Curated annotation (Swiss-Prot):
Signal peptide: none annotated. Belongs to the cytochrome c family. GO terms for cellular component: mitochondrial intermembrane space. Electron carrier protein. The oxidized form of the cytochrome c heme group can accept an electron from the heme group of the cytochrome c1 subunit of cytochrome reductase. Cytochrome c then transfers this electron to the cytochrome oxidase complex, the final protein carrier in the mitochondrial electron-transport chain. This is Cytochrome c. PANTHER family: CYTOCHROME C (PTHR11961). The modification N6,N6,N6-trimethyllysine is found at K80, K94. It comes from Brassica napus (Rape). Gene3D superfamilies: Cytochrome c-like domain (1.10.760.10). Binds 1 heme c group covalently per subunit. It is found in: Mitochondrion intermembrane space. Keywords: Acetylation, Electron transport, Heme, Iron, Metal-binding, Methylation, Mitochondrion, Respiratory chain, Transport. Heme c binds at C22, C25, H26, M88.
């Protein structure tokens, strides 16, 4: 199912998901350094593999996807299927509500 059919996202629930599943490798804080994964500040509207100062896989750079709700919704279902060769070792979020919630949080937290 596509993002058009996704349930409304709850950013508070999304923040909990971020803290438990994403924060060990990513930060959303402006000006913060990269962790194991890139800083996600300014994520929306950015092309994959282009954050300054982070060493991306060739797969991530070559995918050249623009991050927005729709692309993140598909990516977060199964990152390794969406970008084969990605360095991200996250299995994905299978539940549409979890993906919608996380995206709602990221939209606020990375702006």
């Amino acid at each position: 199912a596509s993002f058009d059919e996704a349930p409304p996202g709850n950013s508070k629930a999304g923040e909990k998901i971020f803290k438990t599943k994403c924060a060990q490798c990513h930060t959303v804080d402006k000006g913060a350094g990269h962790k194991q994964g890139p800083n996600l500040n300014g994520l929306f509207g950015r092309q994959s593999g282009t954050t300054a100062g982070y060493s991306y896989s060739a797969a991530n750079k070559n995918k050249a996807v623009e991050w927005e709700e729709k692309t993140l919704y598909d990516y977060l279902l199964n990152p390794k299927k969406y970008i084969p060769g990605t360095k991200m070792v996250f299995p994905g979020l299978k539940k549409p509500q979890d993906r919608a919630d996380l995206i709602a949080y990221l939209k606020e937290a990375t702006a």
